[in-house]
Amino acid sequence: MRLITRLARPLLRLIGRDDRGAIGVLVAVLIGGGVLLGMGALVIDVGQLYQNRAELQNGADAGALAVAQSCAAGTCAPSLAAQFATANASKLTGGAAGVALVCGSGSLGACPASSGAITDCPTAPAGANYVDVHTSTRTAGGSSLLPPAFAALLLGNSGYQGSTVKACAQAEWGAPTALTSGLAVTISACSWDNYTDIGTTFAPAPPYPPDSLPSASQDRVLQFHGKGSNTSCTTEPSGADAPGNFGWTVDSTGNCQTYINGSTYGVKTGASASQACKTALAADQANQTLVFIPVYVSVVGNGANAYYTLKGFAAFVITGYRVPGASASDWLNPANNCSGSSFCLNGYFTQGLIPGPGTMGGTNLGASIAQLSG
C-alpha cells in the first residue's frame, strides 16, 4: 500500500480536489488488473536478486583473498573459497552459497578465458600469481535457482522458477618492491642464501600452538661485521658491512624502521643501536614478532655516503640479540648466544604475509603481499 501511495501522490498534486475520487477509481482498476501488483512483485524480486549478487560478490572477494594469502604462505588452500562464500550468505538462500570454480596459478589450475561479462573476472594478469573465485546461487536445498517471491504468481508467469546469480573475484600475490621494514637492519644475500638453502628451507611462521616451536637447528646467528660460522660470506672493514651478515640501515621513521621504495637504501655505519632500535629489538624478541627486513646484494660507497643495493625482503623472527648496550638470550637455542666482543642477531627465516596492500614485482625471499585485483 505504501508503494501505491508513493506512485499516486505525484498525480494527486497535479489534479484538483474534486478529481481525486476519479483517481481513486483508476488506482482500483490498476489493482484489479494486476498492474500495481506486478510492479510490486518486480521491485521485491529484483531486490532479492541484487541482494544475492552482493552476498556472492562479498563471498568471492573474501574467498579469493583468503586463497591468495594461503598461496603466499606456501600452501594454496582452494577450499577456503567455499568457507568464505558460505560465511557471507544470508537467510535469503538459507545460509548457502555455491562456488562454481577456483582457478589460477600453479596448482590451482588454469582459468578459462574471460567472457568480459560484469559477473566474470578480468583477464589473467600477465606474469603474476593469481586466483579467480567464481561464486553462484545455491540454496540450502541444493538448488542453483533463487526462487521468486511473487513473480511466479503473475498471470502468464507460472512457469518461472527463479534465476541463477553469479559473481567473480580475482586476487594476486607476490613479493613487494617497496616496504617499510619492521626493523632498521639489513642482511646480505649471501647469508640469506646460505641460511635458507637458496630459498628452499624455511621455519614455520608464528604464532605457534603450545609445544610447537621451530626446531633449534633452524636458529641462525647473524654476526655484525664478522663471518661467524658462515665462512663463505666475507666481510669488509668496520663501517662497511658488505657482504657479511647484518648491518644497520638509516632509520626513516624514528621508530627503528626504514622505508624502502627503490633499488637502494641508506647505510648506518657502526655497531651501536639507537634507543628506538633497542626498544624495538626487545619487543620483537619477546613477542616472537615476524619482521620484514631488506636483503642486499652489495654496498656502494663509504661511511655515511654508502648505500645498499636491494635484492628483496625476507621474513625473520628474532630469537635473541647482542648489540652494544643491549642483549637478550636466545629463547629457541641458548647455545647460540653471542659473547665477548661479538655482536649478533639470532633468529630464523620463514615465509610471511605483509599486512595491507602494496606494489608487487620484487624477488621473493619469503615476504609476500596478497590483495584483490579484480
Describe each model-derived feature in a short phrase:
Residues 2-87:
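Alpha-helical assembly-interface signal, strongest on the long, hydrophobic N-terminal helix that forms
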Residues 70, 87-92, 136, 172:
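Conserved, well-folded catalytic cores of nucleic-acid-processing
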Residues 75-82, 95-374:
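N-linked glycosylation sequons
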